[in-house]
Regions:
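Bacterial N-terminal signal peptides
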Residues: 2-12
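N-terminal segments that cap or nucleate solenoid repeat domains
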Residues: 15-50, 54, 127, 131
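Ankyrin repeat structural motif
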Residues: 30-38, 63-71, 97-105, 124-133, ...
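The conserved C-terminal loop/turn that links adjacent ankyrin repeats
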Residues: 41-45, 74-78, 110, 136-138
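Peripheral terminal and inter-domain segments
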Residues: 167-279
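Noncatalytic, solvent-exposed loop/strand surfaces
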Residues: 272-728
Length: 728
């Protein structure tokens, strides 16, 4: 007893105890610490961000020992978070931690339907038996599970569920007959553009089926002439609607949540997502644009992230296979998704060269939150490449050692794009907390430790993803945005010396990945940042000017400045907004419920924001590109939608779009670059495979498009006088 009292006093006298301490111990699997904290008075059911509990974190990790300890100490097994609506059982099942799921079911956890379906999928008889024994399982879900089991090959599980279903027959429903011609009118494809999901309705053996891409068809049964249910899926209903005898929409309701899908008519192009899309033979979008003096591309997506390279002689066609319009190709070692920048005859790129045996990188559309467990020794490096020849002009190693944070499988240890003003080159490497400055000839000028930047999942920060916000130069300072689970801030450093100039704390901000943008207006310059709240600061002092919410919980895109307006998007729940904010605002400019504009906001919507790629403002049109290739064009002044299309027919896109001479350039993760005509309708001009993964945003300067793949840096452009294509 005395030893226990001493231990408790020792804990209480060091730092105040909190739910966060308990969450951290549960995530780390520290059994002793969890017990100590509960003994010291921390509530075992303490709720954190989005009402998450320690039990949820332990279940998510599959730590049966911690789960058992928490339940024995009184943890409520049926508490759910308010964001994902998951209980501890849901966390365990979604990660296939079946032993944890079984334990939770044995201790009264609800969620038998999900457990039963998981047991069928995993072929786990014990899990199936526990789910069948749960009073939480209703007859409708039971019979739907039986239909699913019959499609499988596990006879023992099918027999178990069949016996349970026989004992609980469904109440007979009235037979509804839908004429064949009516069912035929429902057949076709339907799409929800915001979610990027397409559903196909077909007639198979006189019955309607519903298919989501990549999944098995589900048979539908009529409940009325226009409403159908899926016997295999509990609480699932589909309703068709339209006007004048034409079916226009399909609404899917599952568990009380509805989503509307628009009927897709036969488009004029297989790439279209709307009737405005067209396809043209490869050709320049404009005739002989005036070639201007070579302009720099000094930062992420060029000057102030505008992404515009007019007058720089960007070509509209090339061929990697034959070498046509490929000036050079230079290998860049390591894994990095940072983008190239250009000043004069120098192209600057960063990389992190790690364990050659671990090249883990996963492209595509997926939602996996688990990081790559590679904390082996890396070398963080800055390269200067000759823009004319592709030769390495110089390379400088910033640091060699182990990264302090993990990375997402679609990320790297060198995500942030460097910045230059023609004399200084500044790079930030978040996973080692280093801000480094060189002159353009590679001479080290200064290096500053800004602290490891630990970006990750807002729900559980131990799922680390890596920092990607890029530095920006403003006058004689370099500014960095450091948003993480705790301790977020915005800071300016003297460009010549690295000396700190100001720091603005962002105490209520969590991990974000966008880069700050400068907006010039009648009241002076504003530094606009994306995040769970959009904020503007005085770039001279760091003083906050205005705030705007709500926004997505994960924000990646960079704000884009136009004339006296800045455009900001977010593409993740709880809202997916597009905001057009006027320069000169002040204070809290959040809109009242139901409003879409105000004195400070030119226009907005809360449903069509995009996730990873940064929007593009070009010739009075705002283009937003979602990660699934959905391109939406808006009148930038009014927000009126001009068209919506699927670039290249869809796919995964991480690189941001750029524009030049009346053309738009889009690079997907598979390594295809699509050239599209700029304007109020979608016209695809060509597709140009690079045959390597592309995550970085291309750059345009002085006759070349610089395209970085995971393995190489390419210069795409008409051959320079006297030069031939070169491969290093």
């Amino acid at each position: 007893m005395t030893l226990l009292l001493i231990a408790l006093l020792s804990i209480s006298q060091t730092t105040p105890l909190s739910a966060e301490d308990l969450f951290d111990a549960a995530r780390r699997g520290d059994h002793a610490r969890v017990a100590e904290l509960i003994d010291a008075g921390v509530d075992v059911n303490a709720r954190g961000r989005y009402e998450a509990t320690a039990l949820m974190f332990a279940a998510d990790r599959g730590d049966l020992e911690i789960v058992r300890l928490l339940v024995e100490r009184g943890a409520d097994v049926n508490l759910a978070d308010t964001f994902y609506k998951f209980t501890a059982l849901g966390m365990a099942l979604s990660n296939s931690h079946l032993n944890v799921a079984k334990y939770l079911l044995q201790h009264g956890a609800k969620g038998a339907t999900m457990a039963l379906n998981t047991g069928i999928r995993e072929g786990d008889e014990e899990l199936v038996k526990l789910a069948l024994a749960s009073p939480d399982l209703d007859a409708t879900s039971l019979h739907a599970a039986l239909a699913r089991a019959k499609r499988g090959s596990n006879a023992a599980i099918t027999d178990l569920i069949g016996a349970a279903a026989a004992a609980r027959p469904l109440t007979a429903a009235p037979v509804v007959t839908v004429p064949a011609e009516v069912m035929q009118s429902y057949a076709g494809t339907y799409r929800n553009e915001t979610a990027g999901v397409t559903i196909t309705i077909a007639i198979v053996e006189s019955a309607l089926t519903l298919t989501v891409a990549g999944q098995q068809p589900v048979q539908l049964a009529p409940r009325s002439q226009a409403e159908f249910v899926a016997p295999e899926l509990p609480n699932f209903m589909v309703a068709f609607s339209g006007r004048g005898g034409t079916i226009e929409n399909m609404t899917v309701n599952q568990g009380g949540t509805s989503m509307t899908f628009a009927r897709e008519t036969a488009p004029t192009s297989s790439n279209a997502a709307g009737s405005t899309a067209k396809k043209a033979a490869p050709a320049p979008a404009e005739a002989a644009p005036t070639r201007q003096k070579g302009a720099p591309w000094p930062a992420f997506r060029g000057a102030n992230a505008s992404g515009v390279g007019d007058g720089q002689g960007a070509v509209a066609e090339w061929d990697v296979a034959t070498g046509r319009n490929i000036r050079w190709k230079t290998p860049i070692p390591g894994i990095a998704v940072s983008s190239p920048i250009v000043w004069g005859d120098r192209v600057f790129v960063t990389t992190a060269v790690g364990n050659e045996a671990d090249k883990t990188f996963r492209t595509g559309l997926y939602g996996d939150v688990k990081p790559v467990d590679d904390l082996t020794t890396h070398t963080w490096r800055v390269y200067a490449v000759d823009r004319r020849t592709g030769a390495i002009a110089w390379q400088r190693d910033v640091f060699t050692g182990q990264p302090k944070v993990k990375r997402h499988p679609k990320s790297s240890q060198a995500n942030s794009t460097p910045v230059t003003n023609g004399t200084h080159v500044v790079a930030v490497f978040g996973s080692i907390g280093t801000l480094a400055c060189f002159d353009v000839d590679g001479k080290p000028l200064w290096q500053r430790d800004i602290g490891v930047i630990d970006n990750g999942w807002f729900f559980d920060p131990t799922y680390q993803w890596g920092h990607s916000s890029s530095p920006v130069i403003y006058k004689s300072s370099v500014i960095v945005q450091v948003d993480q689970y705790k301790g977020s801030y915005l800071a300016a450093f003297d460009l010549a010396t690295g000396k700190p100039l100001w720091r603005a704390e962002r105490k209520d901000e969590i991990s974000t990945w966008g880069t700050p943008t400068l907006l010039s207006g009648p009241r002076g310059d504003e530094l606009v940042t994306n995040g769970t709240k959009v904020r503007a600061y005085d770039p001279n002092t760091g003083k906050e000017i205005w705030t705007l919410g709500p926004n997505s919980e994960i924000t990646v895109g960079t704000p884009i400045a136009g004339k006296d307006v800045v455009y900001v998007t977010g593409g993740y729940p709880p809202v997916r907004p597009v905001y057009a904010v006027k320069a000169g605002a002040s204070g809290d400019i959040s809109l009242a419920k139901g409003e879409t504009r105000s004195d400070s906001i030119a226009w907005s919507n809360d449903r069509e924001g995009t996730y990873i790629p940064t929007p593009l403002l070009y010739r009075d049109i705002l283009y937003t590109l979602n990660s699934n290739g959905i391109l939406t064009a808006y009148n930038s002044a009014t927000g009126e939608r001009l068209y919506r299309a699927r670039v290249g027919g869809g796919g995964a896109f991480a690189a941001s779009p750029i524009a030049a001479d009346g053309r738009l350039y889009f690079a997907n993760e598979d390594g295809d670059v699509f050239v599209v005509k700029a304007g109020s309708e979608y016209v695809e001009l060509g597709k140009y495979p690079m045959n390597e993964v592309i995550m970085a945003t291309p750059a345009i300067s002085d006759g070349v498009i610089l395209i970085r793949t995971l393995g190489h840096l390419y210069a795409v452009g008409e051959p320079a006088a006297g030069n031939r294509s070169k491969t290093q």
